[in-house]
């Protein structure tokens, strides 16, 4: 039986027994070796590169591997089969598609600004930021031969007196450790739980000094998971962190994940990837950072798209992508942390923001709540740019929503040098029209070199190439120069960082295929907006606000986004970047009982438009797949300098 050794950059080698003919990418997945494969192994993205160090692989040529690179040993793992013992080098993808766990510096005002803004917005709408979770310290007389009251009755009496309730519930998971905790603390303890009318439901009995009651709000993105811990009494953010979604190795988009979970054992693999590999380690890390215990987490909330919600709870997601596109659930009540084996209080409710449709999920419901458009007279667009594109239009009188198949281009997928907005990502760019020389802004320290390009950088680069007349309306190169190179097929590319200027020693560039992929992604966004407006018989001029959310990069240049025809050509002052609205909405849900109820109300009142069956959408999409559009009258401010 052959052995394959994966030499992981920056990590320990992993040795795997396998069979002749095994696919190398599938073998890496079984061994829990992270290889970047946004297309889930269909050969289209070219990102699952590995280097053959020793032995042989059966692999076929690819347009993504040059002859020189092939001679050096570079292969695509998705198109390589095992023929015998071999050793392969696996590049570190942590800085690109998967990010290592990061804990935010809460001393930075930027890290907590979106939560303060969300709380202020909801309070103005009459939402009270209160909940019914409580921590109370009680002291009881210790039992004796003269006082034979059992522990549960002793605690019940103490809580009834302290809280003024008529009934106390002590669930099994609390009861089984009650005797030990009471005696360990000489019957002086802190009790945490939830007030339910005249009843107090105990959730935790612990040492008297442990009075923290904590909420956990989570945004589960297709690419990235972000989480905050908050004090359920004050609303203060205790810790914030993020990590790459462990499911990324099964594909960058939800369709590939759905296909993968439909394979034998796939649902369990995808659920483990999000729970065991992603959520649970972040929770443990943030609790340690905040100095609180995991059982102190008394309520959790989740903002996630419909597919992520299904994969989280382990429900088959096949119906999400199958006609008539009806998911297994929109709203899920009664879910507890113990049901998912999450390291929180086992009785902690897990509130999942309701889904609207197959491709408009709870992340959009939570984001709509946070944006405040549901309580505004102004007609507003809410656009979430992540691995997919979701759009909501309306005001307090109506809300209509849709999702478009933008693909993962906004987070670096489908782009040869694309990556998330992490260290080394080019996030902004200008180009000199005469010299064609770029000036870039790179995420990271001052001496950070370029690794790739994130979504906001891609928008800038394409807009600048079009403005300078370097590419035409189809995204094809029409000027030559040192920065414009062509391969042996004649395909052009623009080099932003030469080999000696990059972090990896490989050039960072954008080619005609990348530009075409992004044009289709931006075309999907614009045509979805146009279709939503058409569905309610509203002109572009009716738009009073445009709220942009998502992981595309906080430095998104709205002018450039309009210039390439991604957003409608409205006054720039109408645009507002609101950050991770799914997370801020989830924060509101976990902190406020009224906000949680309002989220369900917003979902119930929102109309979902299925674009795949909507008349005229495809014609609108095709027309939008140019820079900026086939009808340039729609973009009077789009600039292409002569």
Question: Language-model segments: which ranges?
Answer:
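N-terminal phosphate-binding loop and adjacent alpha-helix
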Residues: 246-289, 414, 425-430, 517, ...
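Nucleotide/phosphate-binding catalytic cleft detector across ATP-hydrolyzing
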Residues: 69-71, 76-217, 222, 234, ...
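Glycine-rich phosphate-binding loop of actin/hexokinase-like ATP-binding domains
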Residues: 218-222, 227-255, 319-332, 366, ...
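A contiguous, well-structured pocket-lining segment that forms one wall/lid of small-molecule binding clefts
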Residues: 466-536
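Glycine-rich phosphate-binding/hydrolytic loop that grips phosphoryl groups
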Residues: 342-343, 354-370, 519-523, 575-610
């Amino acid at each position: 039986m052959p052995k394959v050794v994966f030499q992981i950059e920056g990590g320990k080698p992993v040795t795997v027994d396998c069979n002749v003919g095994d696919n190398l990418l599938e073998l890496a997945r079984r061994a829990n070796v992270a290889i970047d494969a946004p297309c889930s192994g269909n050969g289209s993205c070219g990102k699952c590169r590995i280097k053959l160090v020793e032995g042989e692989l059966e692999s076929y040529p690819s347009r993504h591997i040059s002859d020189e690179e092939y001679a050096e040993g570079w292969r695509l793992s998705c198109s390589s089969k095992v023929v015998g013992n071999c050793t392969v080098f696996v590049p570190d993808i942590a800085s690109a598609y998967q990010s290592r766990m990061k804990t935010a510096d809460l001393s930075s005002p930027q890290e907590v600004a979106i939560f303060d803004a969300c709380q202020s917005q909801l309070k103005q709408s009459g939402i009270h930021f209160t909940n019914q979770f409580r921590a109370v310290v009680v002291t009881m007389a210790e039992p004796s031969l003269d006082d034979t009251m059992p522990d549960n009755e002793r605690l019940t009496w103490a809580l009834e007196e302290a809280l003024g309730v008529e009934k106390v519930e002590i669930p099994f998971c609390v009861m089984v450790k009650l005797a030990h905790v009471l005696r360990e603390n000489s019957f002086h303890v802190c009790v945490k739980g939830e007030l339910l009318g005249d009843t107090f439901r105990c959730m935790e009995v612990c040492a008297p000094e442990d009075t923290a009651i904590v909420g956990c709000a989570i945004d589960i993105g297709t690419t990235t998971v972000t989480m905050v811990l908050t004090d359920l009494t004050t609303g203060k953010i205790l810790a914030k962190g993020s990590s790459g979604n462990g499911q990324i190795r099964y594909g960058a988009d939800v369709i590939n994940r759905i296909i993968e979970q439909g394979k034998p054992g796939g649902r369990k693999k995808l659920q483990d990837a999000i729970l065991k590999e992603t959520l649970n380690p972040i929770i443990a890390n943030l609790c340690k950072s905040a100095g609180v215990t995991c059982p102190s987490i008394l309520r959790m909330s989740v903002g996630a798209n419909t597919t992520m919600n299904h994969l989280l709870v382990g429900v088959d997601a096949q119906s999400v992508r199958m006609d008539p596109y009806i998911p297994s659930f929109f709203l899920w009540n009664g879910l507890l942390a113990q049901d998912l084996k999450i390291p929180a209080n086992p009785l902690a409710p897990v509130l999942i923001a309701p889904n609207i449709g197959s491709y408009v999920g709870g992340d959009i419901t939570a984001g709509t709540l946070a944006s405040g458009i549901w309580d505004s007279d102004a007609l507003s667009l809410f656009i979430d740019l992540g691995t997919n594109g979701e759009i909501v239009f309306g005001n307090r009188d109506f809300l209509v929503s849709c999702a478009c198949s933008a693909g993962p281009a906004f987070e670096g997928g489908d782009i040869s040098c694309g990556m998330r907005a992490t260290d080394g990502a080019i996030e902004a760019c200008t180009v000199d029209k005469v010299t064609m020389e770029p000036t870039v802004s790179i995420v990271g320290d001052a001496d950070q070199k370029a690794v790739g390009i994130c979504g906001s950088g891609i928008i800038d680069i394409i807009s600048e190439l079009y403005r300078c007349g370097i590419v035409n309306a189809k995204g094809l190169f029409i000027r030559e120069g040192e920065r414009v190179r062509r391969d042996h097929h004649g395909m052009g590319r623009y080099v932003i960082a030469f080999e000696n200027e990059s972090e990896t020693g490989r050039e960072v560039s954008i080619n005609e295929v990348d530009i075409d992929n992004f044009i289709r992604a931006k075309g999907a966004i614009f045509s979805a907006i146009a279709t939503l407006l058409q569905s309610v018989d509203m002109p572009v001029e009716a738009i009073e606000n445009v709220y942009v959310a998502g992981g595309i990069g906080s430095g998104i240049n709205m002018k450039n986004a309009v210039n390439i025809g991604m957003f409608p050509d409205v006054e720039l002052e109408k645009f507002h970047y609101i950050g991770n609205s799914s997370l801020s909405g989830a924060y509101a849900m976990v902190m406020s009982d009224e906000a949680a109820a309002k989220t369900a109300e917003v979902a119930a009142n929102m109309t979902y438009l299925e674009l795949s069956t909507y008349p005229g959408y495809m014609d609108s999409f095709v027309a939008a797949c140019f820079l900026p559009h086939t009808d340039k009258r729609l973009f009077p401010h789009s600039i292409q300098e002569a």
